[in-house]
């Protein structure tokens, strides 16, 4: 299972964006963004917002990680 918080942090870094930038976009504090980075799971509404501001489909990343045994 992927660590969604780490994936969000990696994408933010890849885009050369700052934590302050993300906090402004999410209308939250920098501390809240750092807490997001530490999460293994995340609220879907928050993930949708993050996906939109980073132009990255984190839902697809999660879906790609699912293995279904037949």
What are these regions (language model features)?
Residues 1-21:
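A short, Lys/Arg-rich alpha-helix, primarily the initiator
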Residues 13, 38-39, 52:
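Residue-level detection of the helix-turn-helix DNA-binding "recognition helix"
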Residues 45-61:
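DNA major-groove recognition helix of helix-turn-helix/homeodomain DNA-binding modules
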Residues 61-70:
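Short amphipathic recognition helices of helix-turn-helix/homeodomain-type DNA-binding modules
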């Amino acid at each position: 299972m992927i660590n969604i918080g780490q994936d969000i942090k990696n994408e933010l870094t890849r885009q050369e964006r700052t934590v302050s930038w993300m906090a402004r976009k999410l209308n939250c504090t920098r501390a809240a963004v750092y807490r997001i980075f530490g999460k293994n799971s995340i609220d879907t509404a928050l993930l949708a917002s993050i996906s939109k501001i980073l132009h990255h489909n984190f839902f697809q990343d999660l879906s790609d990680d699912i293995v279904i045994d037949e």
